[in-house]
Amino acid sequence: MRFKFLSAALLVLFSVWVIYSFMFWGRPVPFQIQTVERIDGNGDGVIDTWRLDSSQDGQADITELDTDGDGRIDRLQVSHPNVEVIDVSGREPRLARRKLAVCLDGVPYEDMAALWDQGYFREFARPAKLISSFPSLSDVALTELLHTGKVPGYENLYFDTQSNQIAGGATSTVSKVRMPYLDVLDYDEPGIFKGLAYLIPIRIYHADLGRFRKRYAASRLPAYVSHICSTDSVCHVLNREQFLKLMVEVDRLLREIYIQHRGQIDLVVFSDHGNSHVQNRRIDLDGFLAQNGFRMEPAIRSENSVVVPAFGLVGALPVYSQPQNTPKLARLLASHEATDFAVYLEGQQIQICSSRGSAVIEAKGSGGSLKYAAVDGDPLQLKSVLQRMLEQKQLDADGFASTESWFAATAPHEYADAVNAIYQGVTNHVTNRANVFVSLKDGYHYGSPFFDWLVTMRSTHGNLRRTSMTGFFMRNSPMQAAVLPARELLRDFFEEKVH
């Protein structure tokens, strides 16, 4: 009897602890620094002074100033224990300083630029555009950003072509098995929470920020790389106004880190891709394929088998089947109302199919020069771009141009960096390459039926459209480039991290 009573008491205590922990877990981060007021010091209608309270007594003891009117804080005045004025302009060369790279997963350029224009994130220069990889999915994008080895698939759940089965899933982010980019990250949200982000997105987001803050504070690494995954989750399920409101908490978090270092830190903050901010619905791919003589299966069992891993609710999908089906499948999938275009590799050419026509991309040498040629129509809407490149003598006699020229010509296009991105997307990034890759129109997604039942998707990414392909980057020092390919952002950072 006594044992039963003790067991019951322990069970009650454990239940109370679980409930208590859950109630207080995932609450907003208790920031130490509060903004007291924002001031237009010179009366030109633009905020240039931020007065902060770090002692939680309601009195300002830190002042951030933008003295040259460029929008970025360049002077820091600290009033405790003594008054000290610190030059944080970043214009003069400094001795080696600690470096911090923060990836805010899935934050669109337009959103970060809007927040900066409202007076947030002013420790940084105005955000610039960072063009992602194709597909604009995190595993692929982070592989390119962090310059690591190939991941097995386009998402955590992928098709293993050697074993002819679906592999990975949520366990791959927990175990880090065959996910090279995870080994480079000094902080990443534990994999177990990534699926829960659809259920309790705001709690997961708060917990992610708090966990990163704690881990970074405890680290002594001279160069620290972090990935805040939950920003993407909340962008998927909240409307834009709600999302922007939550992003203000990141502003406070980064300001706190900046002040703790008295501005003497090299910060680069960026996103791996953008987001559409368009409510979208899942396509019935299984039914569509069945109507046209194919069968969706978890393995390639016959000439009619098609495998498409269904995981995140995203705007792009890899398609696997018997090689002889590839051209037929590409044309079929391109005819679906939700498809923007489909691509596949045929010999040395990348074939592009869409309702707007077809085209090919060819590479010269090792891929340093590329050619886009419309076969019929203009599937990527590049006719005017090609004409301009021809007039500017950027194309050689055979129609090839350097990857740098293609980037400069197409980075602001609706299909951002289209020629480079498609070439790399079809030939690189993953070890289990798809037979066909489909880019969906905004407003559609494909993925887990369970996740689709669970949430209303107010935004997604994955396709080649500008909103999904355009992330942002910003530094707490002067910036030269207004737009940059993601692969170029962290080259110097990692050279210094290694050395």
Language-model segments: what does each one mean?
Residues 93-94, 115-120, 239-244, 280-290, ...:
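Short secondary-structure boundary/capping segments
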Residues 116-120, 133-249, 363, 368-415, ...:
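His/Asp/Glu-rich, glycine-adjacent segments
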Residues 306-490:
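Active-site neighborhoods of enzymes that stabilize oxyanions during catalysis
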Residues 7-98, 438:
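Calcium-binding acidic motifs and repeat modules
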